[in-house]
């Protein structure tokens, strides 16, 4: 890494000695992984090298061509090393500029091509990264690093395939017990578009029919912050929030594209007049040319409003954290996922894997239907409770479930009596029986039954989980399978629905189940975890059936 030694020449001795000293210091800092400090020293070395090359090539009446050549080679290497340090700090735009400047000096410089390929990978530019690694193979040094280069090439091909097809599979990672680092994933956008939402500002909408479990999008975080809250939860959260704001601010400063994507997010005000962006600007390959250091700073007040409205907690009611990060409290900003609005009839869930949010359909979605998730618990939550939770989030839900229950609540005294009975602690069996008999009298049919069963899921769960209550009420109420089907049909797959079925299977015949029961559980599992778990054994492991 240190490059060639400079010969010492009479009046040039001072600057050349300084260059040698700067290069040694920068190399030492790079090896010690002190990225910021190494960047500072490399910058001094680069500026002085350019000054010396300019002086030797211009005003010097007797330039030394060998010295100029050595200076240029050292400058190329210094730019490459500074790019490497910048990439470690995720300053990919500046790193790319350094790589391009180094390649202007030596277009086939192996180390720079390798570095540029890795930077392009960091920018989710898989095809361009592959071309870099292919060019690097032409260098004689590639023979000593063949395994490394071919490894990167295979990664590019795998990620490019994921980005184009949405063919992700986490099965092997799951079966390993989440050993090692989280898998590196590609960014992916499925059959969706951004449109004006009838319920709240802008939203994501399906452009084709989407089957339950199908990937909708995979997106990398602008920034995340994680930690263990412990006993001082509130104080720890405030520290995390401060760090998170600083990380987002830094990311916005480093890249025009990030600045643009964060700037168009909602601040919670003037929702009706917000720009409707084209989905293509969220594709890394489409927007790459707009990258560069942001000359504009995002107004602090606006940024805080954006983060307040759009930040996502990883371990949320509609999300599941996979791998080692599930041990931590985490918050992050995923720009495209921020367009997903709330509904009490959600059709999407997300998984968090490393820095990525993976959004999939939790039930079948029709073309033209809005992609929604639950911001709060919509099971065991009657209308009034959901209204309170929506208010705490700062909005009023106008989904079809809320409209249906509002009408029923206004016109039916029995519903109000039922809720008062639940508050007094009425027997779960009685409560379920009252709901089921009431639906017959109120002429509630089809999917609407699932809406009310979801609202009073707590008492259904209690009765189906109790052998004593089932002996008493089992013949008077619908079977567990019927109720689970009707609830999942309207609210999507939920961990509690799966758990009930799994526990029931474990009670029967020592955990043996028939094909129909197993397929029902696996179908719910697909809606909960998505089709990123293709191996049956991996899904059964997640469901606690292995």
Show where each model-derived region lies.
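A eukaryotic intrinsically disordered, low-complexity regulatory tract that is acidic and Ser/Pro-rich
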Residues: 200-204, 219-223, 228, 529-534, ...
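SET-domain substrate-recognition elements in eukaryotic SAM-dependent protein methyltransferases
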Residues: 123, 173-176, 197-200, 207-351, ...
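Alpha-helical protein-protein interaction scaffolds
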Residues: 8-165, 435-528, 532-533
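Eukaryotic beta-rich interaction modules
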Residues: 19-31, 39-46, 79, 186-208, ...
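C-terminal SET catalytic tail plus cysteine-rich post-SET Zn-binding segment of SAM-dependent SET-domain
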Residues: 15, 24, 144-145, 152, ...
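Ankyrin-repeat-protein effector appendages
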Residues: 140-198, 206
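Eukaryotic intrinsically disordered and solvent-exposed regulatory patches
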Residues: 12, 64-65, 71, 99-100, ...
């Amino acid at each position: 890494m240190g490059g060639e030694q400079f010969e010492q020449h009479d009046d040039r001795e001072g600057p050349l000695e300084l260059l040698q000293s700067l290069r040694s210091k920068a190399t030492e800092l790079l090896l010690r992984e002190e990225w910021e400090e190494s960047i500072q020293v490399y910058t001094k070395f680069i500026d002085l090298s350019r000054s010396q090359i300019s002086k030797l090539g211009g005003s010097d009446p007797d330039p030394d061509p060998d010295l100029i050549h050595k200076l240029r080679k050292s400058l190329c290497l210094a730019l490459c090393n500074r790019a490497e340090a910048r990439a470690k700090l995720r300053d990919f735009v500046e790193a790319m500029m350094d790589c391009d400047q180094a390649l202007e000096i030596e277009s086939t410089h192996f180390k720079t091509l390798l570095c540029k390929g890795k930077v392009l990978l960091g920018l989710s530019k898989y095809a361009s990264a592959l071309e870099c690694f292919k060019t690097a193979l032409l260098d004689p040094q590639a023979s000593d690093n063949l395994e490394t280069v071919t490894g990167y090439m295979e990664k590019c091909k795998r990620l490019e395939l994921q980005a184009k097809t949405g063919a992700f599979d986490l099965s092997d990672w799951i079966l390993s017990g989440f050993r090692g680092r989280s898998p590196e994933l590609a960014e992916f956008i499925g059959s969706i578009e951004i449109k004006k939402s009838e319920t709240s500002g802008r939203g994501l909408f399906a452009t084709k029919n989407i089957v339950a479990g199908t990937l909708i999008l995979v997106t990398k975080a602008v920034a995340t912050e994680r930690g263990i809250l412990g006993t001082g939860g509130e104080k720890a959260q405030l520290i995390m929030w401060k760090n998170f704001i600083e990380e987002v601010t830094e990311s916005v400063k480093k890249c025009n594209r990030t600045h643009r994507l964060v700037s168009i997010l909602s601040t919670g005000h003037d929702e009706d007049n917000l720009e409707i962006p084209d989905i293509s600007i969220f594709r890394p390959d489409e927007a790459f040319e707009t990258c560069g250091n942001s000359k504009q700073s995002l107004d602090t007040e606006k940024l805080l409003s954006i983060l307040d409205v759009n930040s996502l907690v990883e371990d949320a009611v509609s999300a599941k954290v996979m791998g080692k990060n599930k041990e931590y409290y985490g918050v992050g900003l995923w720009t495209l996922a921020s367009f997903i609005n709330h509904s009490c009839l959600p059709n999407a869930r997300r998984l968090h894997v490393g820095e990525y949010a993976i959004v999939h359909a939790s039930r079948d979605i029709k073309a033209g239907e809005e992609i929604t998730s639950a911001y709060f618990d919509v099971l065991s939550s009657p209308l009034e409770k959901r209204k309170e939770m929506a208010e705490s989030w700062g909005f009023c839900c106008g989904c079809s479930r809320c409209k249906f229950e509002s009408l029923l609540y206004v016109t039916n005294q029995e519903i109000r009596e039922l809720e008062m009975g639940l508050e007094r602690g009425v027997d779960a069996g009685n409560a379920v029986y009252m709901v089921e008999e009431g639906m017959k009298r109120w002429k509630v049919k089809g999917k609407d039954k699932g809406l009310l069963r979801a609202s009073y899921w707590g008492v259904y769960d209690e009765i189906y989980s109790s052998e004593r209550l089932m002996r008493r009420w089992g013949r008077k109420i619908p079977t567990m399978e019927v109720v689970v089907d009707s609830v999942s049909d309207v609210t999507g797959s939920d961990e509690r629905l799966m758990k009930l079925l799994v526990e029931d299977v474990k009670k029967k015949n020592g955990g043996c189940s028939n094909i129909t029961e197993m397929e029902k559980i696996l179908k719910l599992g697909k809606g909960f975890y998505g089709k990123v778990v293709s191996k049956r054994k991996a899904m059964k492991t997640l469901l606690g059936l292995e």
